[in-house]
């Protein structure tokens, strides 16, 4: 396995797919990186030369990926919660932050159903 940005990318996959194993790099970013590094998207990771791997590593180092990106996202959410913005309050309560309705669904964010006992007749 080749190591790029602290992540072991799979040897058998095409480079464009293997790069998406790095947190913060999707298909589009992977394609841009490979175009900049002059590497074919169809090349398998095992077929890359050390020179090509070095160029890819150099370009990926310019991106905010893995731990740095996770830290930035968490700090952004924490900042929203501290300033008590609407989005921050929704994060704090564990509810959807992007305007979805919560009357019926949103079970993923709200967690399992908390049943309320019925009133006896």
From Swiss-Prot:
<keyword id="KW-0689">Ribosomal protein</keyword>
<feature type="region of interest" description="Disordered">
    <location>
        <begin position="91"/>
        <end position="121"/>
    </location>
</feature>
<keyword id="KW-0820">tRNA-binding</keyword>
<dbReference type="InterPro" id="IPR019980">
    <property type="entry name" value="Ribosomal_uS13_bac-type"/>
</dbReference>
<feature type="compositionally biased region" description="Basic residues">
    <location>
        <begin position="106"/>
        <end position="121"/>
    </location>
</feature>
<dbReference type="InterPro" id="IPR010979">
    <property type="entry name" value="Ribosomal_uS13-like_H2TH"/>
</dbReference>
<dbReference type="Pfam" id="PF00416">
    <property type="entry name" value="Ribosomal_S13"/>
</dbReference>
<dbReference type="InterPro" id="IPR027437">
    <property type="entry name" value="Rbsml_uS13_C"/>
</dbReference>
<dbReference type="InterPro" id="IPR001892">
    <property type="entry name" value="Ribosomal_uS13"/>
</dbReference>
<dbReference type="GO" id="GO:0000049">
    <property type="term" value="F:tRNA binding"/>
</dbReference>
<dbReference type="InterPro" id="IPR018269">
    <property type="entry name" value="Ribosomal_uS13_CS"/>
</dbReference>
<keyword id="KW-0694">RNA-binding</keyword>
<dbReference type="GO" id="GO:0003735">
    <property type="term" value="F:structural constituent of ribosome"/>
</dbReference>
<comment type="subunit">
    <text>Part of the 30S ribosomal subunit. Forms a loose heterodimer with protein S19. Forms two bridges to the 50S subunit in the 70S ribosome.</text>
</comment>
<comment type="similarity">
    <text>Belongs to the universal ribosomal protein uS13 family.</text>
</comment>
<dbReference type="GO" id="GO:0005829">
    <property type="term" value="C:cytosol"/>
</dbReference>
<dbReference type="GO" id="GO:0019843">
    <property type="term" value="F:rRNA binding"/>
</dbReference>
<dbReference type="GO" id="GO:0015935">
    <property type="term" value="C:small ribosomal subunit"/>
</dbReference>
<protein>
    <recommendedName>
        <fullName>Small ribosomal subunit protein uS13</fullName>
    </recommendedName>
</protein>
<keyword id="KW-0687">Ribonucleoprotein</keyword>
<comment type="function">
    <text>Located at the top of the head of the 30S subunit, it contacts several helices of the 16S rRNA. In the 70S ribosome it contacts the 23S rRNA (bridge B1a) and protein L5 of the 50S subunit (bridge B1b), connecting the 2 subunits; these bridges are implicated in subunit movement. Contacts the tRNAs in the A and P-sites.</text>
</comment>
<dbReference type="GO" id="GO:0006412">
    <property type="term" value="P:translation"/>
</dbReference>
<keyword id="KW-0699">rRNA-binding</keyword>
């Amino acid at each position: 396995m080749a190591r790029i940005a602290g992540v072991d990318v799979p040897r058998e996959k095409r480079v464009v797919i293997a790069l998406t194993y790095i947190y913060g790099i999707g298909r589009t970013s992977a394609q841009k990186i490979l175009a900049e590094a002059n590497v074919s998207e169809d090349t398998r990771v095992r077929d890359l030369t050390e020179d090509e791997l070095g160029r890819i590593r150099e370009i990926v180092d310019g991106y905010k990926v893995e731990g740095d990106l996770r830290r930035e996202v968490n700090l952004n959410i924490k900042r929203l919660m501290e300033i008590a913005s609407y989005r921050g309050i929704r994060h704090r309560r564990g509810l959807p932050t992007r305007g979805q309705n919560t009357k019926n669904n949103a079970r993923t964010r709200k967690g399992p159903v908390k049943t309320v006992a019925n009133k006896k007749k």
